[in-house]
Regions:
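Small beta-barrel nucleic-acid-binding modules, primarily SNase/OB-fold domains
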Residues: 1-191
Length: 191
């Protein structure tokens, strides 16, 4: 930038000169500030993958993941495992097995979080698909590398679609049917 233009820019946008800005310049500055505040939250809306480490497994479908120095309580999208820690419900059939499977598979492990449309639930938990391999969106990659799908395939949970987070709902329904037909997990035992 030429020296004369640089001085003009610095003079126009120095802290003491806000009052002398034109309305157009003020709007431009406000838009820049607004975009700067939104930037950390874009990752939740774009479907990008965030890398983190599982620091705690709460139960079969809820984890705590450390992402960029921040601990996030994460609820897996599209799958519901039987309860083990609900304050008003007893431990449900196959709940201990689902929790043990999740702990064994994810405790201390590097994972990738994939957000869908709504990033948080009413309890302020992050809603995500959790990948244990580098993510890809083809069906084979989902079966092999997405933990939500693994829970369904192994019969540790049932599908649960809460709109608008339904990116993999059709595939998850097929995976549950496959587990049920094969008698895996909670589909294989008599109560």
């Amino acid at each position: 930038m030429p020296r004369a233009r640089r001085r003009l820019f610095l003079r126009r946008f120095s802290p003491g000169s806000l009052a002398s800005m034109t309305p157009r310049e003020l709007v431009f500055l406000l838009v820049l500030l607004f975009l700067g505040f939104l930037a950390p939250h874009w990752e939740r809306r774009t479907g990008d993958f965030l890398e983190g480490v599982v620091t705690k497994v709460v139960d079969g479908d809820t984890l705590v993941v450390k992402v960029e120095g921040e601990l996030r309580r994460v609820r897996l999208i599209g799958v519901d495992t039987p309860e083990t820690v609900h304050p008003r419900k007893p431990v449900q059939y196959y709940g201990r097995e689902a929790s043990a499977f999740t702990k064994q598979a994810l405790s201390g492990r590097r994972v990738w979080l994939e957000y869908d449309v709504a990033p948080l639930d009413k309890y302020q938990r992050h809603l995500a698909y959790v990948w244990v391999e580098r993510p890809a969106r083809d069906e084979d990659a989902v079966r092999r590398g997405m933990f939500n799908a693994m829970l369904l395939l192994e019969g540790y949970g049932r599908t649960m679609t809460i709109q608008p987070n339904s990116r993999y709902a059709d595939l998850f329904a097929r995976l549950q049917t496959e587990a049920r037909k094969a008698g895996r997990g909670l589909w294989g035992r008599k109560r």
